[in-house]
Structures are given as structure tokens and as C-alpha cells.
Amino acid sequence: MKIKEIIVVEGRDDTARIKLAVDADTIETNGSAIDDHVIDQIRLAQKTRGVIILTDPDFPGEKIRKTISEAVPGCKHAFLPKHLAKPKNKRGIGVEHASVESIRACLENVHEEMEAQPSDISAEDLIHAGLIGGPAAKCRRERLGDLLKIGYTNGKQLQKRLQMFQIKKSDFMSALDTVMREEQNE
């Protein structure tokens, strides 16, 4: 599988794993304190070939994603679910631990960042669905993010991410229905 865009990852182990999965070029941020010259590289890549951000599904990875998104508008985003980024017998989480199939799958389901449009998914919808506040909210948001391929967000950021990736209410409701059915079957 050949990827036209340049994939932004956190480090060289991530690059090695990406190259096992797909034919692609990468830019490494080397941590969450991203140097200006790396941002400049990403800007140039965005202008010439496009950029896909694929960071670890953890707090530092989300911080890197946000930093790049703010500095370089219009990037595409690929999200790797947490459970697919865990090593088999060690601690930690990251792209470098994901299977080749998982990496390919998340790169086939990229979302393009767009100007946030008013959404027909309201904050009340999120509260009513038990995605904000309540004992199961975090688990529900995590599973919803996996199903919609938008990654995990906290309650405050969920509506913004749904708007940014222009998730349709019908897709949201379908994914939410799946989350609720899975919850009942546990």
C-alpha cells in the first residue's frame, strides 16, 4: 500500500513500524517539544504532498497532534485505538507496538481536518447518551472514538472533534447504538 502523504510520527521506532506496514515517508517529531524546524518541515510537506498525523493514543500523542494541527491547518488524521497500540507483555503504549494490519486499517480511515461547522449533534445529545458525566462515560467515549475512527477525547473535546471531522448525526447514532448494545451484552 503506497501512501502519497507524508506521515508524521513521534519517533524512529514508529517510522520503522510504519515502513513495515506501508510504503510511505515519515517526519519524526522526536517528542512533544516540537522544534520550529520540524514544524517548518511539516508545513512544507503539507503544501507539497499532504500530511497524515499518526501519533500514539496517549496524552503526549494528543498534545503533539494538537500542536501540529494548530501550526499546520488542513492535516489529515489517522487514529490508532489504544487496545491496538499496547505491547503483548510490556508496559507502554504506542504506534511501534501496533500490528501491520492495525496500521494499515487506521491509514485507510483517515479524517481530514476541516473548519468546524455547526453540528446537529448537540451537547445535550452527548449528555443524554451518557458520554459526558456518569460512571461509564469514559469507556463509552473511547469505544465511540474507535468506531467512528476519530480517537479518544475527553468530554469537553468530544463535540469539537465530531464537528471538526464533520461526523454526521446518523453515523454518530449508529456508532452509539453499537456501543450501547455491546454494553448490554457484557
Swiss-Prot record:
It catalyses: Endonucleolytic cleavage of RNA, removing 21 and 42 nucleotides, respectively, from the 5'- and 3'-termini of a 5S-rRNA precursor. Disruption phenotype: Not essential. Accumulation of precursor forms of 5S rRNA in total, ribosomes and polysome RNA preparations; smaller forms (126 and 135 nucleotides) are predominantly found in ribosomes and polysomes. Each of the 10 rrn operons gives rise to a different 5S rRNA precursor due to differences in their 3' ends. GO terms for cellular component: cytoplasm. It comes from the Bacteria. Mg(2+) 1 binds at E10, D56. Requires ribosomal protein L18 (rplR) for catalysis; it can be replaced by 30% dimethylsulfoxide suggesting L18 functions as an rRNA folding chaperone. This is Ribonuclease M5. The gene is rnmV.
